Amino acid sequence: MAVLSSLLRSSARLVVTTSRLRLWELVVCKRRTWLSLSVQRCYTSDTSKSSADHLERYKELQRYFKRRLKAKYYKFSNIPDHSAVCGHHHVYFVEGDGIYRMDTRQSEQEQVLNLGQVSGQEEKTGVDNEEMKQRFQWTVQRIRLSPQEKHLAATLKTNHSEELRCVVVRLGQMNSPFLDPPHVVFTLDKVFSFEWATDEVLFYTTLEGLRCSRVFRLDLTSNRSRITSVYEETHPDVFVEVVLSRNRQILTINCNSRTTSEVLLIDTTTSHLKPFLVQPRQQDLLYHVEHWRRWLIILANTGPGQEYQVVQAPLSEPSMVSWVTLFTPGPGTAVKDMDVVRDHCVLVARTPASELVLIVVSLTHPKEAYTVQLPSWTCAINPKKPDMADQRRVFEFLISSPVHSPVPYCLYPEDGLLLSGTKDGSSPENQGNYTTTRLEAYNQDGTLVPITLFHMVPVEGLTQAPLLVHVYGAYGRDLNMEFCPEKRLLLEQGWALAYCHIRGGGERGLSWQRQARVEGKQKGVEDLQACLRHLFSLGVSSPSLTALTACSAGAVPVGALCNKHPHMMRAVTLQAPFLDVLGTMEDPSLPLTLEDREEWGDPVGNPKHRLTISSYCPLHNITPQCYPSILLTAYSGDTRVPLAGVLKYTEQLKKAIHTYITMKPKSECKPAPNIVLNIQSGANHLGPEDFELMLEEEALRLAFLYTELGLDPPQPSRKRKIVRLSGIK
């Protein structure tokens, strides 16, 4: 599935990361022999006290939360996931030291790839110091099998770099004495996406910096291997990716910018494997292609209001003049994804009530569309990649929410039958008494902004509850609402969790993003303010018990709100925060400046854009006043968010607070806010992929929140009430 992910991913200030639960599985598996990773922690200092000293005040509580989090992850270590890859005769899976496979008829497993052997090639990266070599830890990102299971290709990533390495393994018959065991036959560096067209032909894209612009073809023959160039994109704001259709008969070359799409097709059933164009790019046209029989099923924003609808075109005449509408969703319903399952198109959609549903459209009788209701708490849908040998007419997926662990479901589109993996529709462990409330806040311009609130007691009983508010609002991307054990822990300790779906994101369709792009960016800040006011008006928590959390571009509305209304929250945690919008967009030499102009604007070439950015940029609007306490976590090698901007923001913020307290010693700014900068090594934009390091980072955030909000540490399960520390306002 993941049809729209390529349209959203591009090279934005966001990434798709390995599931944290998956990281835990890698830790507890019996074959764990990960290469050791030594990570140095670097802390900057200010004029009075270093951030390292600031961090010391959280250490004891951090150790406590690390133990609690590890126990929570252990509890969920056996929940279902879709990480295994099913071939015709084998199931492939990742365990600590490599990739393994198991014959579906036997229980014995065989190693296909040893990650330790891959790590012996650091010389390609110029690393010659033994201590530095020990910092390399390979994690498997993606696995692809060739059609007849002759070859396996996998991309691997290290903590120190965004670049991926693709390893091609020739597979033999399992445990056969007559054939060679699985062994590496080819290695490619800087590979981002890759798909097999045949057993001997692999198409792939390469990542240069943060941009994919070239497609190559690798031919594996008995004599020698050959690499040829297939496609090169010349537009600097276009990101290129290769994707295989569900039925494996069409390989697409997707060329997407923020506002345009262009798709080339390769028919894998033909011998020449030459790409041909579907529809030339044109401004504000977005589309994605799937395959059904000899037709193309296209998800395109040609519907009312330039929203997504489903159209059809013959494979022989794929251009826009041949597009015929199959299905248009009703007003207020936003299509989030599409899949083709035999003779049906399955759409993931969000209703006007902000609930996720499945819409099934018969491709033989398009007017016979029907809607499949899911549990009301559903906030995320994770489809399973179809098995190679699976010809069933079934769509398998997992549903979850930040506090509900994944539950497996099977949909049989032809019969309209929906089955859960458990009898009662819950996950194997008890989901608990967790309430999901969907709210709407009125912005000053009359726009209704959705809020998803998770809580364990009725809303009227949340007055004294601490509140953690999540926000993003950029690139048309929805807030990440997959299951997270940390959120479950907070909820069980009496917290309320709010997810504010502000404009700039994609929760209410493409227009939701368009309203808060470039000159409309202030609307996202106003939406966040409206959400907080609405929650407080309902009696949910209070400013002194409220914390905001965001990552990457989500730091922009949070930072802007802190400048305008710092008394609306007591604490903030930011991860890999994008805070210097003006400085970044003024510098075309930075990796994402040119690509991001359609999102943030061009302050160099357009005076209006410069004025707009200057009005909300978190760094350039810092003023002497009483700010909330802020924990900033940044990564020294992060190329998406320049570290210089985070350092400059931290320094100026501390100076502004110091100036304010000096000017007004009797001000209400007591206790003084703590501005803590935690700089970690590595290039992972959204944090370490090492489980232990991830636990330390998350435990520090929890320790920071409890300390700055003046909360007692969590009590045992029978004493969950959170009490304010005496003497702290």
State the predicted function of each range.
Residues 129-134, 423-547, 551, 556-557, ...:
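Cap/lid segment of the alpha/beta-hydrolase catalytic domain
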Residues 211, 237, 259-261, 272, ...:
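Flexible loop/turn segments at secondary-structure boundaries
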Residues 80-81, 88-97, 296-297, 391-423:
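Structured, non-catalytic alpha/beta "coupling" segments that mediate domain-domain communication
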Residues 2-361, 480, 484, 681-684, ...:
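Beta-propeller folds
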Residues 502-729:
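Active-site-proximal cap/loop segments of hydrolase catalytic domains
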Residues 276-288, 323-336, 369-385, 422-432:
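Conserved blade-ending motifs and adjacent loop-strand segments that build the rim/top face
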Residues 169, 205, 254, 266, ...:
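Generic beta-strand/beta-sheet core signal
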